[in-house]
UniProtKB/Swiss-Prot annotation:
PANTHER family: FORMAMIDOPYRIMIDINE-DNA GLYCOSYLASE. Pfam families: Fapy_DNA_glyco, H2TH, zf-FPG_IleRS. GO terms for biological process: base-excision repair. Involved in base excision repair of DNA damaged by oxidation or by mutagenic agents. Acts as a DNA glycosylase that recognizes and removes damaged bases. Has a preference for oxidized purines, such as 7,8-dihydro-8-oxoguanine (8-oxoG). Has AP (apurinic/apyrimidinic) lyase activity and introduces nicks in the DNA strand. Cleaves the DNA backbone by beta-delta elimination to generate a single-strand break at the site of the removed base with both 3'- and 5'-phosphates. InterPro entries: DNA_glyclase/AP_lyase_DNA-bd, DNA_glyclase_Znf_dom_DNA_BS, Formamido-pyr_DNA_Glyclase, FPG_cat, MutM-like_N-ter, Ribosomal_uS13-like_H2TH, Znf_DNA_glyclase/AP_lyase, Znf_FPG/IleRS. DNA binds at residues 91, 110. A zinc finger (FPG-type) spans 238-272. The gene is mutM. Its EC number is 3.2.2.23, 4.2.99.18. This is Formamidopyrimidine-DNA glycosylase. Signal peptide: none annotated. Gene3D superfamilies: 1.10.8.50, MutM-like, N-terminal. Keywords: DNA damage, DNA repair, DNA-binding, Glycosidase, Hydrolase, Lyase, Metal-binding, Multifunctional enzyme, Zinc, Zinc-finger. It catalyses: Hydrolysis of DNA containing ring-opened 7-methylguanine residues, releasing 2,6-diamino-4-hydroxy-5-(N-methyl)formamidopyrimidine; 2'-deoxyribonucleotide-(2'-deoxyribose 5'-phosphate)-2'-deoxyribonucleotide-DNA = a 3'-end 2'-deoxyribonucleotide-(2,3-dehydro-2,3-deoxyribose 5'-phosphate)-DNA + a 5'-end 5'-phospho-2'-deoxyribonucleoside-DNA + H(+).
Length: 273
């Protein structure tokens, strides 16, 4: 699943390609992906001009001024821009014909992606219902509320971080990296962490997600940015996908366990419970 760095990289690519472009027509081959009114999606979007490309957590936001599309890529979603003919592909599901003759295509092997067409005034309420936490920046991700939330939760730290309520954007790759960097075992109950460990988790969340953005995201399986380029963050991963390899910090073997149904990578020496 694309995580915050990958979605931010897609946003930046789409911004370069789409800003100022007007939708002339569209085709939707998988109506179930449209989570708001299907008829409104088809009838209200033609004539709309893309004024901004924004992001909230793992959600992309196409901003038309009064209207917005909130797009969630889920497991395998990606956007492709074709300047002339669109090739046949059974995994191409949404087609936006643009005023310069190009076509923006949404591709999704799993068909899990979602689209919500909303009035911009509904955006805040939408994300409030999602209980989405703050963005992982020094300005928005404050330590004191984070510490307070951890102290009041007996959940294991990894599943808790993946809920998106404490901070937006962490997924399976980056949470493993954050907890390795913070020297915290993923199964540790949040309220059993020392305050020093809580602070390390907080600070490493910001540092690693920002590094992921700087490196254009991680190309692990099928991820590409909107320009068709691979990310490079996979070259900087310390623990994710490194089962059986030596820990970069202590040379113990990285192991993989199951936690909450997810493959979880850790160093048993550096990340003791």
């Amino acid at each position: 699943m694309p995580e915050l760095p990958e979605v931010e990289t897609v946003r930046r690519g789409l911004e370069k390609l789409l800003l100022g472009r007007t939708i002339l027509s569209l085709e939707v081959k998988v109506p179930k992906m449209i989570k708001t009114s299907y008829d409104s999606f088809l009838h209200d979007l033609p004539g709309q001009t893309i004024q901004a490309m924004r992001r909230r957590g793992k959600y992309l936001i196409f901003d038309f001024g009064q209207l917005i599309i909130i797009s969630h890529l889920r497991m395998e979603g990606k956007y492709l821009l074709f300047t002339d003919q669109v090739p046949d592909n059974k995994h191409f599901h949404l087609f936006f014909k643009l005023d310069d003759g190009s076509t923006l295509v949404y591709q999704d092997v799993r068909k899990f992606g979602t689209f919500d067409l909303l009035d911009r005034k509904q955006e805040e309420a939408y994300f409030t219902r999602k209980k989405l936490g703050p963005e992982p920046t020094k300005k928005t991700f404050k330590y004191v509320p984070f510490e307070r939330a951890l102290m009041h939760s007996g959940k294991s730290i990894k599943p808790l971080l993946l809920e998106q309520k404490l901070v937006a954007g962490l997924g399976n790759i980056y949470v493993d990296e954050v907890l390795w960097a913070a020297k915290v075992h993923p199964e540790t109950p949040a309220n059993k962490l020392s305050k020093a460990a809580m602070k390390r988790v907080h600070d490493q969340t910001i540092a690693i997600l920002q590094l992921g953005i700087a490196k254009g995201g991680s190309t692990i399986r099928t991820y590409r940015n909107a320009l068709g380029e691979d990310g490079t963050m996979q070259n900087y991963l310390q623990v994710y996908g490194k089962t059986g390899q030596p820990c970069p910090r202590c040379a113990s073997m990285i192991v993989k366990i199951k936690l909450g149904g997810r493959g979880t990578h850790l160093c048993p020496h550096c990340q003791k419970r």
